[in-house]
Amino acid sequence: MLMPKRTKYRKMMKGRNRGYANRGTEFTFGDFALKATEAGRINSRQIEAARIALTRFVKRQGKTWIRVFPDKPLTKKPLETRMGKGKGAVEEWVMNIKPGRIIYEMAGVNEEMARQALTLAMHKLPFKTKFVTRESQNEIY
């Protein structure tokens, strides 16, 4: 599972996920991509589940790039614990996703196969996404 090797601080404040993505919105590696159309939070398990779904569909042809990395710790207190006594332990690692962010890129397969593979990955993610090509990337959301 994806997580940072080490961090400066163990725990982080929740924060708010507002606005649109201003980085990670354009193609870097591949010809086809999965782009977020709404805000959400993705954890390392969801990233891995979607990656497995799309690589199995294309039978490991071509190449896939994961353009997101969960670097934000999410904490949780144990069940049936009274309030207070500090912040809970780190439960999982997440990344805030804003609309317009590219999550996966693919190359080395034809468009129809990439569309089907990325649609399978799309169903594993907790927010709405859409399939984009290098030609159609200028359409915003």
From Swiss-Prot:
<dbReference type="GO" id="GO:0019843">
    <property type="term" value="F:rRNA binding"/>
</dbReference>
<protein>
    <recommendedName>
        <fullName>Large ribosomal subunit protein uL16</fullName>
    </recommendedName>
</protein>
<dbReference type="GO" id="GO:0022625">
    <property type="term" value="C:cytosolic large ribosomal subunit"/>
</dbReference>
<dbReference type="InterPro" id="IPR016180">
    <property type="entry name" value="Ribosomal_uL16_dom"/>
</dbReference>
<dbReference type="InterPro" id="IPR047873">
    <property type="entry name" value="Ribosomal_uL16"/>
</dbReference>
<comment type="function">
    <text>Binds 23S rRNA and is also seen to make contacts with the A and possibly P site tRNAs.</text>
</comment>
<comment type="subunit">
    <text>Part of the 50S ribosomal subunit.</text>
</comment>
<keyword id="KW-0820">tRNA-binding</keyword>
<dbReference type="GO" id="GO:0003735">
    <property type="term" value="F:structural constituent of ribosome"/>
</dbReference>
<keyword id="KW-0689">Ribosomal protein</keyword>
<keyword id="KW-0687">Ribonucleoprotein</keyword>
<keyword id="KW-0699">rRNA-binding</keyword>
<dbReference type="GO" id="GO:0000049">
    <property type="term" value="F:tRNA binding"/>
</dbReference>
<comment type="similarity">
    <text>Belongs to the universal ribosomal protein uL16 family.</text>
</comment>
<dbReference type="InterPro" id="IPR020798">
    <property type="entry name" value="Ribosomal_uL16_CS"/>
</dbReference>
<keyword id="KW-0694">RNA-binding</keyword>
<dbReference type="GO" id="GO:0006412">
    <property type="term" value="P:translation"/>
</dbReference>
<dbReference type="InterPro" id="IPR036920">
    <property type="entry name" value="Ribosomal_uL16_sf"/>
</dbReference>
<dbReference type="Pfam" id="PF00252">
    <property type="entry name" value="Ribosomal_L16"/>
</dbReference>
<dbReference type="InterPro" id="IPR000114">
    <property type="entry name" value="Ribosomal_uL16_bact-type"/>
</dbReference>
